[in-house]
């Protein structure tokens, strides 16, 4: 049986899950590298589960639960009182002893939590992660540089204002980011299927974060991360999906009643996976990890989907075949019962849905696969992969490139009405303020660091606490824009609602690469507010003067002074222009750009 929202509806104790995770790592008996990687995942899962637990309590409007008070001493006292009321004699003594043991365990875990918050500890853990997860020396170097920057920023915050002149402004920005309803930190993407060979991660339902995203509530994001020389077990989903390879190479096979299609996929390739099609993916590369990012559109329940595995692993109920009674299976498969039992028992010896495979088997699975450009057409065909790299860039200059695959040109994308785009912003450059006419864009940070600023009329000025307002309240606040901002790093996700002006910048030391899914992408128009091709320049003279209450010449001096289009450097190229006290500065004040 597939898993999706079970943990959200019936949350388990994060500490107990952490203990089980550590026990699982010890049982594996793998080498030191695998043990370290497993332990790091346990620690990350604990931190994420604790944050999720706090978020659930915050949404329910209760900071303190009377049945389970947060204060450890109150919990201990409550435990002792329950022992007095409900136990007698020897049972009461054992009950009190368990209360004491629980208090000691919580104290040890609090101490470990304090260690995890220590910047030095975080820095060493970050460095270990780089050594384990990144294969190439160049990626390891970039990862370690990010660790160093984060460590220095943390030190600057703790040293006080004298060591960080911009500390107060940075603090406000970090507070805003924590409450940003459109931003999802990489650590908030939960692992649903995890083993030593990889994991499948789901982003929470968009409406779990905020009702502002109810327009895309029937879409989900899933990320596959697989080690070299691995295969994912065959399965199908009750969801349409579009998948993009963001790292490594893959061979993906689709099986339906009439057809079987295999495709070799490179980084930047896009493929549609129809609902109900049995699919399996292999990573036959011996060195590089595989990462695939998928946008799903469930077909049964809005925002909810399941994965259905024919072959189970670890847990007997993971295979849908196991739920059928023996007499049904014996008759349907024409196979004796004892042979079926051996068949199912053999599957339970594996751990997880991503498994290691021999080079011989992997070569056999990929030898008849087609590549992008070889597109089969049939009633149940996926249409084959699309290579974003082979598309001509929609926007390009020395500061960045933007590629896109449109539903108008690719039949594979029409059913979900999704446009897929890939942007690379060079270090120290910006994709200028722009907005989408009808598409809401879900963006995944493939690589690099940067930040974005977005103008939004739906959030309040107080740490975005008004994000769930009713429609009437939203209408009353029309025209009152607030800046929504976040710092971006690899693995983060953010959403750009239709009509919202946004600017995205890359950091000074590395390029920023972004993958975008434009929902309602057919015939979407992208309008730019700066650069040579901005829409302000197309306004009539009288419209400009009436709008900005200034002479046309001064307005045009501002909007025509940028020599580049779409992507520009963040450093000023010209000495022309005015300071913030110039009257025309109000043009961009509405969006805080």
From Swiss-Prot:
Glycans are attached at residue 229. Keywords: Allergen, Coiled coil, Copper, Glycoprotein, Metal-binding, Seed storage protein, Storage protein. Residues 49-58, 76-85, 101-110, 463-470, 541-555 are annotated as: IgE-binding. InterPro entries: Cupin_1 (IPR006045), RmlC-like_jellyroll (IPR014710), RmlC_Cupin_sf (IPR011051), Seed_Storage-Functional (IPR050253), Vicilin_N (IPR006792). Residues 529-556 form a coiled coil. SMART domains: Cupin_1. Residues 46-123, 150-184 are annotated as: Disordered. GO terms for molecular function: copper ion binding; nutrient reservoir activity. SUPFAM superfamilies: RmlC-like cupins. It holds the Pfam family Cupin_1. Residues 187-341, 386-556 form the Cupin type-1 domain. Seed storage protein. PANTHER family: OS03G0336100 PROTEIN-RELATED, VICILIN C72. This is Vicilin Jug r 2.0101.
């Amino acid at each position: 049986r597939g898993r999706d929202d079970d943990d959200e509806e019936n949350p388990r104790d994060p500490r107990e899950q952490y203990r089980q995770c550590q026990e699982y790592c010890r049982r594996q008996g793998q080498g030191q590298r695998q043990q370290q990687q497993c332990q790091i995942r346990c620690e990350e899962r604990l931190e994420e589960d604790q944050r999720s637990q706090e978020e659930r309590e915050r949404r329910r409007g209760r900071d303190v639960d009377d049945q389970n008070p947060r204060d450890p001493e109150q919990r201990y006292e409550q435990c002792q009182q329950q022992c007095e009321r409900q136990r007698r004699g020897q049972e009461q003594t054992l009950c009190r002893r368990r209360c004491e043991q629980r208090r000691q365990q919580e104290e040890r875990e609090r101490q470990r939590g304090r260690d995890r918050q220590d910047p030095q500890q975080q820095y060493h853990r970050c460095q270990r992660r780089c050594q384990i997860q990144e294969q190439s020396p160049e990626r390891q170097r970039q990862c370690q540089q990010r660790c160093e920057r984060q460590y220095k920023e943390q030190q600057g915050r703790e040293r006080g204002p004298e060591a960080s002149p911009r500390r107060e402004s940075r603090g406000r920005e970090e507070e805003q980011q924590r409450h940003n309803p459109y931003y999802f930190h990489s650590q908030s993407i939960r692992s649903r299927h995890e083993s030593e060979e990889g994991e499948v991660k789901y982003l929470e339902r968009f409406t779990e974060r905020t009702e502002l995203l109810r327009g895309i509530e029937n879409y989900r994001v899933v990320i596959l991360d697989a080690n070299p020389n691995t295969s994912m077990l065959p399965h199908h989903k009750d969801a349409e999906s579009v998948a993009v390879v963001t790292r490594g190479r893959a061979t993906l096979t689709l099986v339906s009643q009439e057809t079987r299609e295999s495709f070799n996929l490179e980084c930047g390739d896009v493929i549609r996976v129809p609902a109900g099609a049995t699919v399996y993916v292999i990573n036959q590369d011996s060195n590089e990890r595989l990462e695939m990012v998928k946008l799903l559109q469930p077909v049964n329940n809005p925002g909810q989907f399941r994965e259905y595995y024919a072959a189970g692993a670890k847990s007997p109920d993971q295979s849908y075949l196991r739920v059928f009674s023996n007499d049904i299976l014996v008759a349907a498969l024409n196979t004796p019962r004892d042979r079926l039992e051996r068949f199912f028992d053999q599957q339970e010896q594996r751990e997880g849905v991503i498994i290691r495979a021999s080079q011989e088997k992997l070569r056999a699975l990929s030898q008849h696969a087609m590549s992008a450009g070889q597109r089969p057409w049939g009633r149940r065909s996926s249409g084959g992969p699309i290579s974003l790299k082979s598309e001509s860039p929609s926007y390009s200059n020395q500061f960045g490139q933007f590629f896109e695959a449109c539903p108008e040109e690719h039949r594979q994308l029409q059913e979900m009405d999704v446009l897929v785009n890939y942007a690379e912003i060079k270090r120290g450059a910006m994709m200028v303020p722009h907005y989408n006419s009808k598409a809401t864009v879900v963006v995944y940070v493939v690589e690099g660091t940067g930040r974005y600023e977005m103008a939004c009329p739906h959030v309040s000025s107080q740490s975005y606490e008004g994000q769930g307002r009713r429609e009437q309240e939203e209408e009353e606040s029309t025209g009152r824009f607030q800046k929504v901002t976040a710092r971006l790093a690899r693995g983060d996700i953010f959403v750009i609602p239709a009509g919202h002006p946004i600017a995205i910048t890359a950091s000074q030391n590395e390029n920023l690469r972004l993958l975008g899914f434009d929902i309602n992408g057919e015939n979407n128009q992208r309008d730019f507010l700066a650069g040579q091709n901005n829409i302000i320049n197309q306004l009539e003279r009288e419209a400009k003067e009436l709008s900005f209450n200034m002479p046309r010449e001064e307005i045009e001096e501002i909007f025509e002074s940028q020599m580049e289009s779409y992507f520009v450097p963040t450093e000023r190229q010209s000495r022309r222009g005015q300071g913030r006290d110039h009257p025309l500065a109000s043009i961009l004040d509405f969006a805080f750009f």
